[in-house]
Regions:
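Short coil/turn connectors between adjacent alpha-helices in alpha-solenoid helical repeat scaffolds
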Residues: 17-26, 77-89
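N-terminal alpha-helical interaction modules that lie
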Residues: 1-68, 97, 119-125
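Structural register within alpha-helical repeat arrays
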Residues: 7, 13-14, 71-78, 92
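Mid-chain, well-packed structural core segment of small domains
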Residues: 61-85
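Amphipathic alpha-helical binding modules
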Residues: 84-125
Length: 125
């Protein structure tokens, strides 16, 4: 659980940096460290189905869904830095929908993120 808490703090730092205009300078390293901590990367997430991603992220503690939510948020933050953001946003959206269905708790925050992603996808399309 310590890993999940630390990754949550990293994501908060990513959002803070982006909102402060420092995202391009500081966020790539934080995103890379966070993916290494999750023992995954963008390529794996983009090329696998949510079920497979959950299994890979489960680890010894069975917290795959929690890690998947963090991975989805990392994809969103990475999309702000990418010259090709749509695949990242589409996968983040897919993972968040998967979480809404498979997690035991309904999340309003996830629903708001999904709405924001939808708006951004339409804007970029």
């Amino acid at each position: 659980m310590v890993q999940i808490e630390e990754l949550g703090k990293a994501i908060a730092q990513l959002v803070f940096n982006r909102n402060a205009g420092n995202g391009p300078d500081k966020n790539p390293e934080i995103i890379g460290q966070s993916f290494r901590s999750l023992k995954t990367d963008t390529a794996f997430l983009l090329n696998h189905e949510p079920d497979d991603i959950e299994l890979a992220l489960n680890g010894e503690d069975g917290c795959g869904l929690e890690r998947m939510e963090l991975a989805a948020k990392l994809l969103i933050e990475e999309s702000y830095l990418s010259s090709v953001p749509l695949p990242l946003l589409n996968k983040a959206q897919e993972l968040l929908y998967y979480l809404q269905i498979h997690d035991t708790a309904f999340s309003l925050e996830r629903m708001m993120l999904l709405q924001d992603i939808e708006v951004e996808i339409k804007r970029l399309s």
